[in-house]
Structure formats: structure tokens, C-alpha cells
């Protein structure tokens, strides 16, 4: 989707929480500020700061080394702090996806990026939550959530293809 002067479709800057976290764009509450890998890392660090007894500290003893996997590793280790971080992350991701699905009602939503490497640990609860948030529930058929086969390179390949078609 492309708007006037090739602008628009900046879904990362759709507000999902009014007055929320400050986004890199300067607005508050943007989808990207809650459901990106950067947001997951920020929330993991905050949670670790608040809970010095969390197993996350054993998984990643240095806050500077926290990455998009850290909270999921903690979840798999049974850490309650990590579980809360992942649950919140999935809730925000689901909210944004459901908002878009309620507008466009696609057959499928294809996710990309490093966090998608978490597979079913991410996708199973995300699918359940998204389909619960859809207008009319699954009456109109659930939205299929899947991971891009190009993984973390999907954006790069898409940008290259766009450039080849438009330059």
C-alpha cells in the first residue's frame, strides 16, 4: 500500500497505546515502540533491572548483551519475569496485527525479522490472541500468521526488488 508521494503504510507508527512509550519518530504509543525487536530488548532490560533475582541475569549477565532472544530463552527456562515480558510483547504485537487485519482482512499475515526465529513459542500464542481480537472473531475465517521464508532478510530482498522495479 502506497500513499501520496510514496508515503503511507507506515504501520509501525500506528498508535496502539495513546500516550505510551516514546517512539523514535517522536510520537508516543506507536506499534513499533511496543512490538519491534528494539522494544522487546528495552522491555527485557527494564524487567531485569527491576528483578535482580530473575534467571535472565544467568542467561545474560550484562544488560548490554540483551538481544531479541534473551526473554524467550528466559521463558523456556521457566523464569516468571521473562514470561511476563514475552506475554506483553505478544499482546502488543497481536493488537497491532489485529488492528490491521480488521481494516484489510487479509488471508494471511507474513511476519519477518529475527524474533520470528522463536517459531511456535511466538506464533502459537500470537495466533490465538490475534484471532480473538478480530472483529467477528473467526466467523469470517481466522487470519493465517506465518513466518517469511526469507527470515530476517525479507526486508532487504523486498527493498532490492522495489528498487529494481522502480528505478
Residue ranges and their predicted role:
Residues 15-22, 27-167:
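ATP-binding/phosphotransfer module of carbohydrate and carboxylate kinases, centering on a glycine-rich
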Amino acid at each position: 500500500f502506497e500513499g501520496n508521494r510514496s508515503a503511507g503504510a507506515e504501520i509501525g507508527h500506528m498508535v496502539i497505546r495513546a500516550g505510551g512509550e516514546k517512539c523514535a519518530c517522536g510520537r508516543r504509543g506507536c506499534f513499533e515502540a511496543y512490538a519491534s525487536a528494539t522494544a522487546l530488548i528495552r522491555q527485557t532490560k527494564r524487567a531485569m533491572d527491576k528483578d535482580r533475582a530473575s534467571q535472565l541475569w544467568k542467561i545474560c549477565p550484562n544488560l548490554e548483551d540483551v538481544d531479541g532472544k534473551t526473554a524467550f530463552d528466559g521463558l523456556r527456562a521457566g523464569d516468571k519475569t521473562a514470561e511476563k515480558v514475552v506475554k506483553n510483547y505478544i499482546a502488543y504485537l497481536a493488537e497491532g496485527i489485529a488492528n490491521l487485519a480488521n481494516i484489510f482482512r487479509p488471508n494471511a499475515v507474513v511476519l519477518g525479522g529475527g524474533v520470528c526465529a522463536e517459531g511456535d513459542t511466538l506464533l502459537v500464542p500470537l495466533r490465538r490472541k490475534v484471532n480473538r481480537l478480530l472483529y467477528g472473531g473467526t466467523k469470517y475465517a481466522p487470519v493465517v500468521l506465518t513466518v517469511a521464508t526469507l527470515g530476517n532478510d525479507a526486508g532487504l530482498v523486498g527493498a532490492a526488488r522495489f528498487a529494481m522495479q522502480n528505478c
